[in-house]
């Protein structure tokens, strides 16, 4: 092949390749244009399918149907829903079942339906049980013979969402729904006459009978006459509460109903102002053998109606046997081994706390009632026939509750001034804190060892310059005003001390006791007159290793300094000054040192600060009380009874369960077994110390000087408040009980 032929062939190949390349580029360009058109078309289609922005947001359904719930699809509130209609499942469209909480596992699914579904289920279930049980009177009689005249509902057959749309439309919330019974609440059967031993003696016989229809079927009110879980009883419209759960809506409605009666409404106002209960704000509900009406003649039985809001009366004493019915022996036997509760009464007589042996729930097993004769009569009464029981119940008195009047709630009004203006008229001279600190110094030097005295002196010396700096510019009028502020604060604390129910003490900044509560005297044996300096202090318990000292009193040879008003240029005559007990005399050595070290930090430190720690209070013991002292462990004998409540301690016998008694008639209580004032006196009887935890803070006056020290604490099984120159701390501190 010649060179010319080769060159021509290459030229032809290049031309063909160029044409192919041009064709390829054109093809690529066409494909890209088609792709762009396709994407644009898809975007337009997507934009066309987009939701209209003006379209309102679809409301979320309260509960999806079963099919939509399994498919995780959007459902509606209507039944059948639109999706089930499109798919042809409209006949099987019903609410789905949600996962129940653990406390609802025993409740059927029908009772958890939203709105009125649960009431409709209860009504349908009650009607079905009435029809099925028309020929079974034996089962009904078995339920009636219960001593409490109610039984838990028998296990019914739940057909599970078998109601149709017609049933939902035909059923309304009317009076017939008041008889609906929740499956988790007790059933009160009223289909047959009730035995009179389960009803109130004043209830007519017709109240225990239920009218029935002509065909023998029970009436629409044959179910519950008092069902706490029935929303119709409290006029609750659960459908309007927008709750998805029957029990949640009922709980919310019950809280609202309870809140309607907490206002300060006078007792004479109508009960309807507190929220009506039942169909006509009244009903019938009787306790076993009791009638809580005003009288059996002028009023009938009621259920929390208008008559239930009337004032309580004192017409007759409470009959314990009649109140607790035939189970009185069983109740008393079960409660005989429990520790007796106690309450300290410092209010009017109608608030007096009954003695431990007077409580019907705290009687011993050997004597269930007041005496053996009553117990024998009660046992013989159980064997009498029904007519005799009816006659006896008619003759028994009406059970009444104590009368509670608003005007009788004036605690401590006999000793309290009518107003605070008398304080400003009575205070004429300032209080000598200098004499108080001198007396405190003499007491500390006499009681404590040199090492402990040095620690206390260092703590007080650290705040002495601050006291001097804050008081050097005060004149006589300022000091008088300071004392008026102190007395005014005590006047304010009077109600707190009487109402708190815990041992309370109020002291000045020198540690001198200014006020004390009755509970503190009962617990420690320190009488109020002794603590305030109105009576001599004969205490010999200083917290030593032997518990009690047989030597001199805690005062020793110390003579209180007389208070002279010459230092204030008011008079030249010296007036004897009463010396109250110091706080240091009520604590053991370690507690006193710890207190003053903390007081030095808090006196001029944080005005809102507080200290929480433990301490040991010393019991009040005289030489007569310490007549018998154990040689080895320092236990106190039976003669250690306090002046407060000592007589009651000897009245305790040793026949109760779980307790032992000493040879001199005293009782040793176990941990947590405290009964009345006598039981409180037993605290710390071994070593003369009561261990407790306490919290205290400092209250300052208008000159920013510590005025009061407030201590709140708690003894074994008993709260204690020790207020020493400060604002009371209302927080309750649990006891740190140690063996």
Swiss-Prot record:
Region (Disordered): 1-62, 174-223, 264-308, 380-420, 537-574, 639-668
Cystine pairings recorded for this chain: none
Top-level taxon of origin: Eukaryota
Major localisation: nucleus
Protein name according to UniProt: Transcription activator of gluconeogenesis MCYG_04674
Biased composition (Basic and acidic residues): 40-55
Biased composition annotated in UniProt, kind: Low complexity: 547-557, 653-664
Keywords: Activator, DNA-binding, Gluconeogenesis, Metal-binding, Nucleus, Transcription, Transcription regulation, Zinc
Pfam families noted in UniProt: PAS_13 (PF24990)
Zinc recorded as keyword: yes
Family as reported in the entry's similarity comment: Belongs to the ERT1/acuK family.
Function field: Transcription factor which regulates nonfermentable carbon utilization. Activator of gluconeogenetic genes.
UniProt-annotated location(s): Nucleus
Compositional bias annotation for Polar residues: 1-33, 267-284, 397-411, 562-574
Entry-linked PROSITE patterns: ZN2_CY6_FUNGAL_2 (PS50048)
SUPFAM superfamilies: Zn2/Cys6 DNA-binding domain (SSF57701)
GO biological process: cellular response to starvation; gluconeogenesis
Stretch forming the signal peptide: none
GO cellular component: nucleus
PANTHER family associated with the record: TRANSCRIPTION ACTIVATOR OF GLUCONEOGENESIS ERT1, ZN(II)2CYS6 TRANSCRIPTION FACTOR (EUROFUNG)-RELATED
Location of the DNA-binding region in this protein: 65-93
Molecular function terms from GO: DNA-binding transcription factor activity, RNA polymerase II-specific; RNA polymerase II transcription regulatory region sequence-specific DNA binding; zinc ion binding
